[in-house]
UniProtKB/Swiss-Prot annotation:
The gene is dapB. Pathway: Amino-acid biosynthesis; L-lysine biosynthesis via DAP pathway; (S)-tetrahydrodipicolinate from L-aspartate: step 4/4. Pfam families: DapB_C, DapB_N. One of its GO terms (cellular component) is cytosol. Transmembrane segments: none annotated. This is 4-hydroxy-tetrahydrodipicolinate reductase.
Amino acid sequence: MTIRIAIAGPRGRMGREAVALVQQTDHFELAAVIDRRYDGQNLAEIDGFSGVNAPIYTDAARCFAEVKPDVLIDLTTPEAGKRHTELALRYGVRPVVGTTGFTPEDIERLTKLAEEKEIGAIIAPNFAVGAVLMMKFARMAAKYFTDVEIIELHHDQKLDAPSGTALKTAQLIAEVRPSKKQGHPNEKETLAGARGAEYDGIPIHSVRLPGFVAHQEVIFGGNGQTLTIRHDSFDRRSFMSGVKLAVETVMHLHTLVYGLEHILE
């Protein structure tokens, strides 16, 4: 069965990889793209997309109404991603979203909408399979090491901090670890923020520098030992195997799934 796909954000770095993925996959068809510019033009007319035929829409609702794609791949910004996800569900389009910034309230509201429409949706803070495994391994380790800190490192153009992956990792760890205050009970920051942000007592540190793509390490400490679990994405192609899996899986879902780990066997 051919899956007809609309891509939001095709000119971004992740969006370009998604366009290439769709073009290279026999049972995927690029039905349309959603962009801030070039309304009414064809993607093939844009530099870097020679031979890639797809109508360009600046209005997501009009795209969904006229093209009726099976799936939306959204790799845009938190604000646009939230708007596109809700619109897609209302028009019966299954969203696969790699945008971070969704709150628990957003997830709850969108889950209800997906179930009302009886269609699937997948929102994943990270589509790299290795990163998802890192999160799963961290959750396993937290049962035995309750002292933990997270360091995430990304390119200096990333808008949100901490990353969605770091927050998701902390949430998974918190599910199996008692909430606690780490470090010395009388610890004092001599420079505000030196110990990082906190999620349920878990310090999270964000690094933003040119040269990085997406990297994270989870450091556990115990008596006489430490355990470090680290994942590195050196190229945005690392995310595409997860995007492909999500597109194929969302066609068979009837609810929203948050996190790629829930669809990995």
